[in-house]
From Swiss-Prot:
PANTHER family xrefs: ALANINE RACEMASE, ALANINE RACEMASE, BIOSYNTHETIC
Record lineage: Bacteria, Pseudomonadati, Pseudomonadota, Gammaproteobacteria, Vibrionales
Protein name in UniProt: Alanine racemase
Stored CDD domains: PLPDE_III_AR_proteobact
Binding sites annotated in the UniProt record for substrate: 129, 302
Active-site residues from the entry: 34 (proton acceptor), 254 (proton acceptor)
Organism of origin: Vibrio parahaemolyticus serotype O3:K6 (strain RIMD 2210633)
Pathway annotation: Amino-acid biosynthesis; D-alanine biosynthesis; D-alanine from L-alanine: step 1/1
Length: 358
């Protein structure tokens, strides 16, 4: 019997992608598969996200992995290329790139490429992380349009900083700025990622870029993906390796941070921070065992965690324990831990077995 295992429901992935298409019917879909498909397995995700019109990645290595496994659809390097030496690789493998800074623009102007590269100009519409500032926009447009290494027409994109906050005044300002700058442009545009396409439909332009929602995880702090009609793709599970009697007043685990207030039974589950489950998970973080949630009791260790099963528990060694999934939303677990679900699904370690089902 394996210990921690991540079960990936590929039919749920396909359901979610179809739902994105239904919610943004006038847009083409760029499925974002960076960070190993948000921890779900890049190659499997790309193979089964076959209704996507293109793929978005963060690193050139991810793009090359997609090409190596037979993906022929467009691939966009969302952070752009890191050095001039990457440009011939983009040409050879037909990879599109974002341009967000002067250094990338100069590299394109100085390169000697066999064929032009498809470029998306990233505009800093208000997040202030990457992108061309509005006062730089005209100069960048002029230089990119006259650069022989840039395929025409030029494309345009930006990224929201607060799209998951529905009362934010920043997002409408970002939309207004982006639309005013790109009004009348011939090239295609992209503004909405997961939160944008769900909460700000006016940002659904020629392309949308679903990321976390495609994996059945909500971008919002107050809603699960299931609340929004999406299905969890990942279920992280393990099993009980011990059920122990603990007396009132006895402490459990490193540091003795949990002390039992009554005689009870404590279950030991074969999963820990060595598998990517956060050591920071506090007492009370829920785990699903035999049809109910039970609280973590004690500090998460490298290979194990402990839960309070209750004094009348009938759970047995080898019974299944679900850390998150359909029965226990990953968003709920993340809220208890004080993090976001994105972090939980992307931080599983290689020793977690990946099991794919359709």
């Amino acid at each position: 019997m394996k210990a921690a295992k991540a079960c990936i429901d590929l039919s749920a992935l396909q359901h979610n992608l179809q739902r994105v298409k239904a919610q943004a019917p006038e847009s083409k879909v760029m499925a974002v598969v960076k960070a190993n498909g948000y921890g779900h397995g890049l190659r499997h995700v790309a193979k089964h996200a076959n209704h996507a019109d293109a793929f978005g990645v963060a690193r050139i290595e991810e793009a090359l992995q997609l090409r190596a496994c037979g993906v022929v659809k467009p691939i966009l390097l969302l952070e752009g290329f890191y050095s001039p030496g990457d440009l011939p690789v983009l040409v050879t493998n037909n990879i599109q790139t974002v341009v967000h800074c002067e250094e990338q623009l100069i590299a394109l102007e100085q390169a000697d490429l066999e064929t032009p590269v498809v470029v998306w100009l990233k505009i800093d519409s208000g997040m202030h992380r990457l992108g061309v500032r509005p006062e730089q926009y005209d100069e960048f447009i002029s230089r990119l349009k006259t650069c022989p290494n840039v395929a025409k027409p030029l494309r345009y994109m930006s990224h929201f900083g607060c799209a998951d906050e529905l009362d934010s005044s920043i997002t409408p300002q970002q939309i207004e700025l982006f639309m005013s700058l790109t009004s009348g442009c011939q090239g295609e545009r992209s503004l909405a990622a997961s939160a944008g396409l769900l909460a700000w439909p006016q940002s659904q332009l020629e392309w949308v870029r679903p990321g976390i929602i495609m994996y059945g995880v909500s971008p919002f702090s107050d809603k699960t993906a299931q609340d929004l009609g999406y299905q969890p793709v990942m279920t992280l599970k393990s099993h009980l390796i011990a059920v122990r009697e603990v007396k009132q007043g006895e402490s459990v685990g490193y540091g003795g941070i949990w002390t039992s207030e009554r005689d009870t039974k404590v279950g030991v589950i074969a999963v820990g921070y060595g598998d990517g489950y956060p050591r920071s998970a506090p007492n009370g973080t829920p785990v699903w065992v035999n049809g109910r949630t039970v609280p973590i009791a004690g500090r998460v260790s490298m290979d194990m965690l402990t839960v309070d099963l209750g004094p009348d528990a009938t759970d047995k060694v080898s019974d299944e324990a679900i850390l998150w999934g359909k029965e226990l939303p990953v968003e709920e677990v993340a809220n208890h831990i004080g993090t976001i679900a994105y972090e939980l699904v992307t931080k599983l370690t290689p020793r977690v077995e990946m099991e794919y089902t359709k």
